[in-house]
Structures are given as structure tokens and as C-alpha cells.
Amino acid sequence: MKKEKRQRLIKQFVKEYEIEKQERLVELLAKKDVLVTQATVSRDIRELNVTKVPSQEGLMIYKIFSEEHLQTDIKLKKKLREVVVKIDCVDQLMVIKTLPGNAHVIGVLFDELDWKEKIGCICGNDTCLIISQSKSDREILEERLNLII
């Protein structure tokens, strides 16, 4: 099996299904008569910029990110670790307290990521308010941030 075809199938499966484990990808590939090991799938996942993110149901599933999206994600992780002082949450609101002069940077990075759980954000000098549609959406954002920080 050619690597390109196998990786094309992996991309297709990740887009079509909520896949939690690499073993599931091995099973789906086998149904297409593509026999591979979990180690091969693991290498393919790295090469394809596939990463785990929380699903609507709170499960950690694989998703493919573009290179641009991946760079923004890396910038957000770095900045959050450097400048976040405290995160408070209530209902569908998340308040991120930062070192002075840094809240707007966090807001810009959140906007660039365009996470569907976020309706918008309002930032001042040292505080960024992230607004979600619902408490469950905010909890997904909170889980993502906790994985980062």
C-alpha cells in the first residue's frame, strides 16, 4: 500500500468519524484492505498534523489542522504559559487574567483559532473575556486551556 493512499484514507476517516484511538484507524484501514500496524498509523498521524481535541460530547478525538492553524495553536500555548495569571469561569463565560498589557494578544490568538465553541472575546489591558454559547461549550474551551497550561 502506498503511503500517500494510506494517509489520504486516514484524513478521510478523521473527517468522517469521531476517532478516539489509533487502533480504530487500524481497524478502518483493514476494512479497506490496508493492513498496517498502530506504529505506522502513529507516524502517519504526526506527518499529517493530526492532533486530539475535545469533541462536542467531551471525548478526545483526532482532528487535522492546517499548518497555519497549527502555528496559531503553538503561539497560543506559548503565550498562555507566559502571561496567564488566573482563569475563572462561570456559566458560558471565561475570564482570563493576564500580566498587564497581554490580554489583547490572547484575544487575537483566540480569534485566529476560530474555535466553534467561542462566540467572541473582549479584551482589555490585563483581562480577556471569552464568551461561549453554552456552559458545555465553555467547559470544552476550559478543558482545552487546561491541557495547554
Swiss-Prot record:
GO aspect biological process, one term: protein complex oligomerization
Molecular functions (GO terms): arginine binding; DNA binding; DNA-binding transcription factor activity
Pathway: Amino-acid degradation; L-arginine degradation via ADI pathway
Subcellular location as annotated: Cytoplasm
Domain of life: Bacteria
Subcellular location, principal: cytoplasm
HAMAP family for the chain: Arg_repressor
Function comment: Regulates the transcription of the arc operon, involved in arginine catabolism.
Name recorded for this polypeptide: Arginine regulator
Encoding gene per record: argR1
